[in-house]
Amino acid sequence: MGTYYIKQKVFSFKDSFSVFDADQQEVYRVKSKLFSLQDRLTITDLNDQPLVEIKQQLAFLKPRYIIEENGQQVAEVTKNFTFFKANFSLKPQNWSLDGDVWSHQYTLTDGNEPLMHVTKKWFTWGDTYEMQIEDESHLLTYIAVMIVLDMVLHNNNGSFSMDGGGGE
């Protein structure tokens, strides 16, 4: 099992995050396009080489994001309509991300098998998420899923939501 932290950079004109390992060593960066009509973020290595693209798809009620590695789609993340909960489905994996938007605790599962547990850290400068990952073979996809969660819960992306998804 591995532990990683996603920390939002506070004083930035665009969405910007750093990903740290359990030893607090930066391992990845996440940057958004400054002037873009749709959310589009890139996960890079420390040399700013792109590894993963996260692209928002236009949707009326259900925010949807495409995650691509090397130009190939690896996942489609869709926010499901729920009251006071976070619930996302991932295709083609059949994974589900569920959690409580008030306590900020989330679990990514494959059926009943937990893949990742996430807790938002309180009293930090900017958003910080702690990720406990069971199997690191999909680490970049897990990081991308957490970035999508943060974007949907904070930005609401123009979608109607009854679950606390309009900012915190």
Segments (PLM) and residue ranges:
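Intrinsically disordered, low-complexity proline/glycine-rich segments
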Residues: 1-168
